[in-house]
Swiss-Prot record:
This is ATP synthase subunit c. F(1)F(0) ATP synthase produces ATP from ADP in the presence of a proton or sodium gradient. F-type ATPases consist of two structural domains, F(1) containing the extramembraneous catalytic core and F(0) containing the membrane proton channel, linked together by a central stalk and a peripheral stalk. During catalysis, ATP synthesis in the catalytic domain of F(1) is coupled via a rotary mechanism of the central stalk subunits to proton translocation. Key component of the F(0) channel; it plays a direct role in translocation across the membrane. A homomeric c-ring of between 10-14 subunits forms the central stalk rotor element with the F(1) delta and epsilon subunits. It comes from Clavibacter sepedonicus. The keyword Cell division does not apply. The gene is atpE. The record marks 62 as: Reversibly protonated during proton transport. F-type ATPases have 2 components, F(1) - the catalytic core - and F(0) - the membrane proton channel. F(1) has five subunits: alpha(3), beta(3), gamma(1), delta(1), epsilon(1). F(0) has three main subunits: a(1), b(2) and c(10-14). The alpha and beta chains form an alternating ring which encloses part of the gamma chain. F(1) is attached to F(0) by a central stalk formed by the gamma and epsilon chains, while a peripheral stalk is formed by the delta and b chains. SUPFAM superfamilies: F1F0 ATP synthase subunit C (SSF81333). The chain crosses the membrane at residues 13-33, 55-75.
């Protein structure tokens, strides 16, 4: 195959790969936030502690998306 066409195909596949890698953290953030709201409804006095834990969980989930983004830039060059 022509090297230019091969490079374009590789770039497009990497873009799709990053999109798929972002799905997992998106689902994870939704689950964490939903379960936190559910827990706050059950025990309102724990809301502050639950909120802090929720933000930590969201941060760890989003770290996966950032790793996926970094991987995209590493492998497309």
């Amino acid at each position: 195959m022509d090297p230019i066409i091969t490079a374009e195909i590789t770039g497009n596949i990497a873009t799709v790969g990053y999109g798929l890698a972002a799905i997992g953290p998106g689902i994870g953030v939704g689950i964490v936030a939903g379960k936190t709201v559910e827990a706050m409804a059950r025990q309102p006095e724990m809301a502050g502690s639950l909120r802090t834990t929720m933000f930590l969980g969201i941060a760890f989930s989003e770290a996966l998306a950032l790793i996926g983004l970094a991987t995209y830039f590493i492998f497309t060059n």
